[in-house]
């Protein structure tokens, strides 16, 4: 081998080694990928999800078909890690009417019981919606916290976390606000369910992750771009490398659930593996 060939080969090897080192952090076994499935079991679809390497699923409640879902999940060894509270938009904890707030709280309690029954650990909750003078930002903050705190004994009894998600509802559009809201709930049972794509519109997703820190217990996986809105993973403005870096810094471990469409669950599996280093 001549000197020129040696130097070229060595430089190439060093570059590959550097790339390998830069990509060496893997979240395999640390982040568990899942998809959302609704309220009814679909054994064929669940089997495909399992075959594609997903670690679990997330359902909706109330209305979850608890016993049939438990049976299929057990047969396939595909756990349901939690549920989304399906009524939080229509029947809100922040509604101006106290009777509606009570109804929403009771529905959330049922969702918590359903989550426990299927072996889950959490309920995803949107705490309210800013609609006007009778339901402004402060109303959403105060009313939702009042209702959530009434459910803290149940959360502890069931060992179920109430995980707050920020969406395009006029509430907590700054990561510092969301952090402070979680802290105002004043309970280890109330933490963050951070949606990576939802909040990219208001501040880079990796900044949200950094500011929320260890308050984030679970992730919704989405992408969003200023030109194309919600889109397949990897086609928006989310900087996935920076997202991974911040997740590593906060020592995140837990569930990451895809919400959205990538043209097939097989493509979703591949994209999640690539973008989350699974």
Stretch-by-stretch model annotation:
Residues 10-12, 16, 23-27, 94-194, ...:
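Active-site acidic/histidine proton-transfer and metal-coordination neighborhood
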Residues 46-47, 71, 113, 153, ...:
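Alpha-helical segments flanking ligand/cofactor-binding loops in enzyme cores
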Residues 37, 57-59, 125, 164, ...:
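Conserved beta-strand positions
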Residues 52, 76, 158:
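Conserved dinucleotide-binding and phosphotransfer motif residues
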Residues 39, 43, 55, 59-146, ...:
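Structural motif corresponding to the early beta-alpha repeats
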Residues 4-34, 40-50, 120, 175-190, ...:
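Histidine-acidic metal/acid-base catalytic patches
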Residues 68-75, 147-154, 242-246:
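Catalytic-core regions built around general acid/base machinery
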